[in-house]
């Protein structure tokens, strides 16, 4: 029996908890340090604490009190605060990189400079600036659409692109000033990049800092509303395909992307002196020239974790424990199944608190009948047993099927028939044939096919 600490309380962490507790290779006793009372994790946990996951001392105390064998950290914020370093000081191996290697996410400037220094392919033209005037001059010099990125963590909502959230270069320059004036991201630095044109996708890879095991490619849908409209969110849903690729990605595109991840793992160790232990998440854009790195994350994606964990088979506990120890062992395979994840969110998400505090009713037996799986996110289990929403994403439903169409129907039916609430919504277009085909056609145009 292994005692495992799980840090975090979103749908991603619920999926991790289910994967660890349901794994055949090792019995697990789960302990959770959560930011909210996630009913799915509470049900699986032997014991739990509700607190601030970025309070590394509190996390370390809880881990020591429970005498855990190893820890798994879900979100990026605790990793950026050095929770893995602090747990290691207590003698607790941790799945999730120390603060130095985690810088690949919490400082976007570091990520770009690392790629440049070690000549890792997939770099757009970019500049890093600590002075807003210099950044604005660079935008003028480029004279073409740009992406404006705060250097620090913004919960996936800080990047703005000309032609999407920004109308023109003048608005880009206004946003640069706003980043410095409002301290967006918490680091007084901005990255300006040429706008890449193509289709975005994610590949997550397990690594102990030496070996790398890639997982199926996933496509996220960050826009709030159907048809890829509205503000950027933490992710409204995602899909994966039975062959581990996506309809617009070739095997060669996938392999080139994995090579970028492998070289990045190697570069992180050389640069920081610390091996990267955990999941390295690469967000790519497939362009006419091939894969370009949009950004790296230092943990499982949310929602992308929900596309790979339910179809993972093999030594899941051994894999996580051995990565935490620093020498990856265990076999992991992925079923040749399609997955579609759709998030149910409060009506006002992400711009207002409309729906916050409302009860959401979830019939789990009904969901399972549709070949779907529920993962609870930013909700709280009341003392009276009711599940109440916060202002963030509430519930992820993952449909699984032999083909993408089946998986999408499973997720959509489960939401429509098994989930209810007065002020909830979801994107029904995620994983639908028309949505995917639109992306395939666009990619063919870009590649001149």
Curated annotation (Swiss-Prot):
Q: Which InterPro entries match?
A: ATP-grasp, ATP_grasp_subdomain_1, PreATP-grasp_dom_sf, PRibGlycinamid_synth_ATP-grasp, PRibGlycinamide_synth, PRibGlycinamide_synth_C-dom, PRibGlycinamide_synth_C_sf, PRibGlycinamide_synth_N
Q: Which UniProt keywords are present, listed alphabetically?
A: ATP-binding, Ligase, Magnesium, Manganese, Metal-binding, Nucleotide-binding, Purine biosynthesis
Q: In which pathway does it act?
A: Purine metabolism; IMP biosynthesis via de novo pathway; N(1)-(5-phospho-D-ribosyl)glycinamide from 5-phospho-alpha-D-ribose 1-diphosphate: step 2/2
Which positions are annotated as binding Mg(2+) 1? 283, 295
Which residues does the annotation say bind Mn(2+) 1? Answer: 283, 295
Classification via Pfam families? GARS_A, GARS_C, GARS_N
Give the residues the record marks as binding Mn(2+) 2. 295, 297
The record lists the catalysed reaction(s) as: 5-phospho-beta-D-ribosylamine + glycine + ATP = N(1)-(5-phospho-beta-D-ribosyl)glycinamide + ADP + phosphate + H(+)
GO molecular function per UniProt: ATP binding; metal ion binding; phosphoribosylamine-glycine ligase activity
- Note on how the cofactor is bound: Binds 2 magnesium or manganese ions per subunit.
In which family does this protein belong, per the annotation? Belongs to the GARS family.
Q: Supply the name of the protein.
A: Phosphoribosylamine--glycine ligase
**The organism's taxonomic lineage, starting at the top:** Archaea, Methanobacteriati, Methanobacteriota, Methanomada group, Methanopyri
């Amino acid at each position: 029996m292994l005692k495992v600490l799980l840090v975090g309380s979103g749908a991603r962490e619920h999926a991790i908890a289910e994967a660890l507790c349901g794994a055949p290779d090792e019995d697990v006793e789960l302990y959770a340090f959560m930011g909210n009372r996630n009913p799915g994790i509470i049900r699986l946990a032997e014991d739990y604490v509700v607190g601030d996951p970025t309070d590394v001392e509190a996390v370390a105390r809880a881990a020591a009190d429970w005498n855990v064998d190893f820890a798994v950290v879900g979100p990026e914020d605790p990793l950026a605060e050095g929770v893995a370093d602090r747990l290691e000081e207590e003698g607790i191996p941790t799945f999730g990189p120390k603060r130095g290697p985690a810088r690949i996410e919490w400082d976007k400037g570091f990520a770009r400079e690392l790629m440049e220094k070690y000549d890792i392919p997939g770099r757009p033209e970019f500049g890093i600036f600590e002075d807003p005037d210099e950044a604005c001059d660079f935008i003028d010099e480029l004279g073409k659409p740009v992406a404006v990125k705060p250097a620090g963590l913004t919960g996936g909502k800080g990047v703005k692109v000309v032609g999407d959230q920004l109308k023109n270069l003048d608005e880009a320059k206004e946003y640069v000033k706003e980043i410095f004036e409002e301290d967006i991201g918490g680091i007084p630095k901005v990255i300006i990049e040429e706008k890449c044109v193509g289709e975005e996708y994610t590949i997550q890879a397990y690594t102990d800092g030496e070996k790398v095991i890639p997982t199926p490619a996933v496509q996220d849908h960050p826009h709030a509303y159907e048809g890829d409209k509205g503000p950027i969110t933490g992710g409204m849903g995602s899909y994966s395909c039975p062959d581990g690729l996506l309809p617009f990605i070739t095997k060669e595109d996938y392999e080139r992307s994995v090579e970028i991840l492998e070289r990045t793992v190697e570069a992180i160790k050389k640069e920081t002196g610390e091996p990267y232990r955990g999941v390295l998440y690469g967000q790519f854009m497939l362009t006419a020239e091939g894969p370009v790195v949009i950004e790296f994350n230092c943990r499982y994606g949310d929602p992308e974790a929900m596309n790979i964990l339910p179809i993972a088979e093999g030594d899941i506990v051994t894999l996580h424990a051995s990565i935490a120890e620093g020498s990856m062992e265990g076999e992991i395979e992925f079923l040749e199944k399609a997955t579609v994840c759709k998030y149910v969110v409060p009506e006002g998400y992400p711009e207002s608190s409309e729906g916050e505090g409302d009860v959401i009713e979830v019939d789990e037996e009904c969901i399972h009948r549709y070949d779907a799986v529920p993962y609870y996110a930013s909700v709280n289990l009341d003392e009276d047993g009711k599940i109440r929403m916060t202002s963030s994403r509430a519930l992820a439903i993952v449909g699984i099927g032999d083909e993408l169409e089946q998986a999408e129907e499973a997720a959509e039916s489960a939401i429509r028939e098994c989930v209810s609430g007065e002020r909830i919504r979801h994107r029904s277009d995620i994983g639908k044939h028309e949505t995917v085909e639109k992306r395939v056609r666009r990619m063919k145009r870009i590649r001149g096919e």
